[in-house]
């Protein structure tokens, strides 16, 4: 018989840097999960993606065991890394903060494909370009 799901916890944690401090500790502590067990497993799984923020969905079962799925980093994080900026524009319609080549947008879209509900890389590119526009990043050919 399958285990009964008690709770789903969604977090965004820097790769390889999960620790029992907030936000990880309180979120998992409420569910009664072994926090150190999760932190060690997450850090081992994401150590090759250092510097990126990794979304994770943790499924907690009634017997307090858990499984988790790591997703691809958010498009905004990948765009900031590609453009070499710390944060997006506060006024994206007036103030542009960086430019990114279309090739780089394609690369980001291909990275994000498993998590996007896009039929092709071209539609995924449009989604990434929309994120870039809302951050004040200009896309050039």
UniProtKB/Swiss-Prot annotation:
GO CC annotation, single: cytosolic large ribosomal subunit
InterPro entries reported in the protein's UniProt record: Ribosomal_uL11, Ribosomal_uL11_bac-typ, Ribosomal_uL11_C, Ribosomal_uL11_C_sf, Ribosomal_uL11_N, Ribosomal_uL11_N_sf
Gene Ontology biological-process annotations: translation
PTM characteristics: One or more lysine residues are methylated.
One function term, GO molecular function aspect: large ribosomal subunit rRNA binding
Cited CDD domains: Ribosomal_L11
Keywords, in A-Z order: Methylation, Ribonucleoprotein, Ribosomal protein, RNA-binding, rRNA-binding
ATP-binding found in the keyword field: no
Subunit comment: Part of the ribosomal stalk of the 50S ribosomal subunit. Interacts with L10 and the large rRNA to form the base of the stalk. L10 forms an elongated spine to which L12 dimers bind in a sequential fashion forming a multimeric L10(L12)X complex.
Free-text function comment from the UniProt entry: Forms part of the ribosomal stalk which helps the ribosome interact with GTP-bound translation factors.
PANTHER family with a match to the protein in the record: 60S RIBOSOMAL PROTEIN L12, LARGE RIBOSOMAL SUBUNIT PROTEIN UL11M
Family affiliation: Belongs to the universal ribosomal protein uL11 family.
Name of the protein: Large ribosomal subunit protein uL11
Organism: Exiguobacterium sibiricum (strain DSM 17290 / CCUG 55495 / CIP 109462 / JCM 13490 / 255-15)
Organismal lineage: Bacteria, Bacillati, Bacillota, Bacilli, Bacillales
